Amino acid sequence: MYLPQNKLKDWRVRHQPKACPLLLRKTSDWVVDHCHKSGMVRGVVSRVGNSLLGKIENFAYRRCQVSQSHLPAVLRAIADYVEQEQLDVLHPVGLTQLSKDLNP
């Protein structure tokens, strides 16, 4: 289905969720997100969430040479990595912050 520009706002209003599916929070500033390669609509997201998604996609494609089809797997791996249990080793930057916290 082709969605002309003059129908975009009405479509967005009818399809916007209660909260942004990317940032998991309510907003009043919605946009219709689309794949820049295919032009197909992915959904309705917050403007800030859409901006974040664009920055992540551009960085992954341009700097990391991650293909569009491989990006979801990479993002899942990043989420798994961030959620994993931390090692019992303090980084030097952590020591600096700890000393600031202990000696205000």
Per-region residue spans from a language model:
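Short, charged surface segments at domain edges that flank catalytic/cofactor-binding sites
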Residues: M1-A19
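General structural signal for secondary-structure boundaries
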Residues: M1-K7, S46, L71, T96
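Histidine-centered nuclease catalytic patch
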Residues: Q5, A19-N58
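Generic structural signal of hydrophobic/aromatic residues within well-ordered alpha-helices
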Residues: L8-R12, G49, L71, I78
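Polybasic, low-complexity binding patches
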Residues: K37-M40, L53-N103
